[in-house]
Amino acid sequence: EYLRNLKNINLSDEDFNKIFLKKKKIALFALHYEPEAATNILGKNFNDQVLAIETLSKLLNDEWLILVKEHKDPPQSYKFRGNLFFERLKKIDNLYFINKDYKLTEIIEKADLISTITGTAGWEAINLGKKCLVFGNAWYQEIYGCTKYNDELTYDKFSKELNIPFDNQKFKES
């Protein structure tokens, strides 16, 4: 079932390369293993990863595309990503599901925003000079370059923050 769903939703390599030619901003959402403490405990209200992705889609406007990347080695995730998981993702118009074999750092370097619940993808992003948005209680959420989602966060408020160039000095001092 998992493999069939992947086949139906995965973006082809050719289409993946075309995404970066579009005149849209790219937000990467890196999926977690399931089950995992990073989502089940630290994710708080966002222990449902699709809910976090749906919230991200509502937060960003139509200038954005969302790339959802499967964890590179989901040993048991296939048991927890059933039909409903993929059906909900398919309902998000600006979303593309990408192959787990793409290197995360290469996508981070091309993306405008990295989003995760609490994962190391956010930490990797700010270390590479990219802004990140976390939905759970990530250990790095107070560090410069990272924004923690809350219900009061609006696109206008968030876009102002995103438009400020990343300041490596502030990151090093935080």
Outline where the language-model segments fall.
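Conserved catalytic-core segment of nucleotide-activated headgroup transferases in glycan assembly
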Residues: 1-83
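A short, aliphatic-rich alpha-helical micro-motif
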Residues: 21, 90, 108-109
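Short, glycine-/Ser/Thr-/acidic-enriched flexible segments
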Residues: 34, 73, 121, 139-140, ...
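A donor-sugar binding/catalytic signature common to diverse glycosyltransferases
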Residues: 100-147
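Leloir-type glycosyltransferase catalytic cores
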Residues: 145-174
